[in-house]
Regions:
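Alpha-helical interface subdomain recognition
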Residues: 1-85, 101-106, 113, 117-118, ...
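Short Ser/Thr-interspersed hydrophobic loop/turn segments at strand-loop and sheet-helix junctions
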Residues: 51, 74-79, 170, 187-191, ...
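Short beta-strand-to-turn element immediately C-terminal to the catalytic PLP-Schiff-base lysine
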Residues: 100-102, 142, 168-171, 186-188, ...
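A generic local secondary-structure boundary/capping motif
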Residues: 110-112, 129, 138-140, 154-158, ...
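A short, Trp-centered hydrophobic/proline-enriched beta-strand micro-motif
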Residues: 117-126, 168
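Flexible, small-/acidic-enriched active-site or ligand-binding loops
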Residues: 136-138, 156, 188-219
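A short core secondary-structure module
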Residues: 151-195
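Long, acidic (Asp/Glu-rich), low-complexity accessory segments flanking structured domains
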Residues: 213-231
Length: 392
């Protein structure tokens, strides 16, 4: 099994590591999340200069043509620094939809602008009643002449307040939970009929409730084919789930390492608490959970993501297993730090909150375990032996 990075991946890893080290020390991050904007535009410009915004995009549009392993490298390091800029919403989620469904005109006009940092996008798909079901869409789009008129409500749209454009899912035909009949629309966030209510989330990131009232959208702003967006949405959300899992693995490493160091330095009754055998066992269990989380992340990254059956199974297996690791490592870190683990001034509680949020993002452990079991029992996907183990 060869898990070594290629030379290009090593350079990418070193570059992102250097960015986090130089621009995301703890005090700097605290100032960023406490600001009114909740992110730093200078960092976004630096992402563009470093080429990070172009990692997953095709070279034909100015991107680097990176794969899932390259996104894993970026997101894992972002997790270690708790980077709050909207990389996942813009580059991976919305950018992935544009790459997958966009016309040549749309891709040529939007993707280079994302790569240069001039455009930020967010994907508005979740609704109050939908939970994790991507097909549950009540927001409607009715054709009226050359325009569609959209009405509805979208919940917890990450990065919307920082975005210049939204991609909105709406139902153009069919029943509320039908997979067919869902269409995507690209809209400017300043459009009349669109209202954003922005707020900080528990993990200090930013999200928005999006109110859509008689929003007129030209037929030219339809992304992909009318009524046929569901399969692409599921695919890009799966790829985004792997990216979120990568971020979680970076967070778990920080929690594991910082807790081990704290236990070595914390003195009780004249000796380090790390000499206590019960604590040693807990630290070893944290390490095991982290290593298993990283291993199953590699499994998902190296799966054939173009094969929808294999992709679904690999993604749900990884999300369910990493969700379990998040719970154990996160809770253990808080417990072993004692009172220090819950104070806002110390980093551990912030890493725990972000990890917990990732645990429910794109589906929690129970959801993905059920999805995985359904796929397995249905005979969907090939055997585990067909999954490549090479990171490259």
């Amino acid at each position: 099994m060869n898990f070594d990075y290629t030379e290009e991946q090593t350079l990418l890893d070193n570059m992102v590591t250097s960015f986090v080290r130089d621009n995301y020390d703890w005090d700097t991050r605290c100032n960023i999340v406490k600001s009114e904007e909740g992110w730093k535009e200078e960092n976004w410009k630096q992402f563009a200069e470093l080429g990070l915004l172009g990692v997953p995009f095709d070279e034909a549009y100015g991107g680097l043509g990176g794969k899932s392993a390259d996104l894993m490298i970026v997101m894992e390091q972002f997790g270690k620094g708790l980077v709050v800029e909207p990389y996942l919403p813009t580059v991976i989620l919305a950018g992935g939809l544009i790459s997958k469904l966009g016309s040549e005109e749309q891709k040529n006009s939007i993707i280079p602008e994302i790569i240069s940092g001039n455009i930020r996008c967010a994907f508005a798909y979740a609704e109050p009643q939908s939970r994790f079901d991507l097909n549950d869409v009540k927001t409607s789009a009715v054709l009226n002449g050359d325009d569609y008129v959209l009405n509805g409500f979208k919940s917890v749209v990450f990065g919307a307040g920082m975005a210049s454009h939204l991609i909105i899912s709406a139902r153009t035909e069919g029943e509320q939970r039908s997979e067919s009949g869902i269409t995507l629309f690209i809209v400017d966030t300043k459009s009349e009929g669109l209202t954003l209510q922005n707020y900080p989330t528990v993990d200090e990131y930013r999200a928005s409730e999006v109110i859509i009232e008689n929003l007129k959208v030209s037929k030219d702003n339809v992304l992909g084919k009318v009524n046929m967006a569901y399969d692409a949405i599921e695919e890009i959300v799966d790829i985004s789930t792997i990216a979120a899992c990568s971020e979680a693995v970076g967070i778990l490493q920080v929690l594991k390492d910082s807790t081990t160091e704290y236990c070595k330095n914390r003195k009780q009754f004249g000796q380090s608490i790390a000499k206590n055998q019960v604590i040693q066992h807990r630290l070893v269990d944290m390490m095991i959970e982290y290593e298993q989380a990283k291993s199953i992340l590699y499994m998902a990254v190296t799966a054939d993501l173009t094969n929808s059956d294999e992709r679904r199974k690999a993604v749900s297996a990884a999300k369910a297993r990493i969700g379990k690791a998040i719970k154990f490592v996160g809770e253990s870190a808080i417990q072993l730090h004692g009172g220090m683990g819950v104070v806002d001034e110390y980093m551990v509680s912030h890493y725990f909150k972000r990890a917990t949020m990732i645990g429910v993002l794109f589906g929690n452990t129970d959801y993905h375990m059920k999805r995985y079991m359904t796929l397995t029992q249905s005979g969907i996907s090939s055997s585990d032996e067909s999954i490549s183990v090479s990171v490259t």
